[in-house]
Amino acid sequence: MESHGSGLRRVLLLSFCVAGIWAAYIYQGILQETLSTKKFGEDGKRFEHLAFLNLAQNVICLVWSYIMIKLWSNGGSGGAPWWTYWSAGITNTIGPAMGIEALKYISYPAQVLAKSSKMIPVMLMGSLVYGIRYTLPEYLCTFLVAGGVSMFALLKTSSKTISKLAHPNAPLGYGLCFLNLAFDGFTNATQDSITARYPKTNAWDIMLGMNLWGTIYNMVYMFGLPHGSGFEAVQFCKQHPEAAWDILMYCLCGAVGQNFIFLTISRFGSLANTTITTTRKFVSIVVSSVLSGNPLSSKQWGCVSMVFGGLSYQIYLKWRKLQRMQKKKKA
């Protein structure tokens, strides 16, 4: 009876995590798409300063992580010093800026799909640079994802979707997304190196360090350089309060979503988190198609299914590998 109650609590907690991640990031996606395509006010101006979203997100997450550390930290030391994140902060500033800038050139569903193909640069780098040999099923996953994204990019986008874009340019948009993935790869590798050197580093320490440097770099880029558009972004928000509200909600969704991701990984592992976030991306495309008026053709839906079929198969392979490792430990 006790084990039944414990199992029920785990199911409820997992459901809570799924709902939290889906709600936070699906709504954040809606806001991101709104800010990149909507014409605000009577003058019908677009919010062209999308890099400002990254600065705002850094500031909110910096404050959020600091509060969480003060509330939940046990006061122990041994985590990575704040200055160790300076290099990861550079790539983590440039990568997301490219990803969000891509929304000027391609639709939100296209951006989500392109950014879902993270395994492609990882496997390319692994095989070409490090000589890693992958299994046939792993190559099959990559083929499905790469093929789906490529065919989606080559298919004709609806005129309604194109009319919403600030500067339609598919090659540039997809190029920015793949550069985003490349920079993300360097960021993840650097974070892994930091946590290996400082094992007592927790998720909040990483969030604080990354967003501290992200805030510094984005402040310099937006307000310190001659071509920086920080002041124009602030002025736009003053003239269009609804845009400022959307930006605030966008940032809060990111901070809350991180909370649920940390909770999911700590209680259920990274595989469960990968499954939840992958399905969330698929739902985000469906929501964008239905709510934001980005109609996809049957061929495009086939490409979407192909990509997420490959991602689902990858998750299954990871699950099988995890099961085999657990059996070896028991033996």
UniProtKB/Swiss-Prot annotation:
How does the protein's chain sit in the membrane according to the entry? Multi-pass membrane protein
A GO CC term attached to the entry: Golgi membrane
Per the record, the GO terms for biological process are:
embryo sac development; endoplasmic reticulum unfolded protein response; pollen development
Which InterPro entries does this chain map to? SCL35B1-4/HUT1 (IPR013657)
This protein's UniProt keywords: Antiport, Endoplasmic reticulum, Golgi apparatus, Membrane, Sugar transport, Transmembrane, Transmembrane helix, Transport
Q: What is its induction behaviour? A: Up-regulated by stimuli that trigger unfolded protein accumulation in the ER (UPR) (e.g. DTT or tunicamycin).
Asked if the keyword ATP-binding belongs to this entry, the reply reads no
The short motif Di-lysine motif is annotated over 327-331
What terms describe the molecular function in GO for this protein? antiporter activity; UDP-glucose transmembrane transporter activity
Q: Null mutant: what phenotype?
A: Lethal.
Instruction: Mark the transmembrane ranges.
Output: 11-31, 49-69, 80-100, 112-132, 135-155, 170-190, 206-226, 245-265
Has the keyword Transmembrane been applied to this entry? yes
- Entry domain remark: The di-lysine motif confers endoplasmic reticulum localization for type I membrane proteins.
Family from the record: Belongs to the nucleotide-sugar transporter family. UDP-galactose:UMP antiporter (TC 2.A.7.11) subfamily.
What's the protein called, per UniProt?
UDP-galactose/UDP-glucose transporter 3
Q: Which organism is it from?
A: Arabidopsis thaliana
Highest classification ranks of the organism: Eukaryota, Viridiplantae, Streptophyta, Embryophyta, Tracheophyta
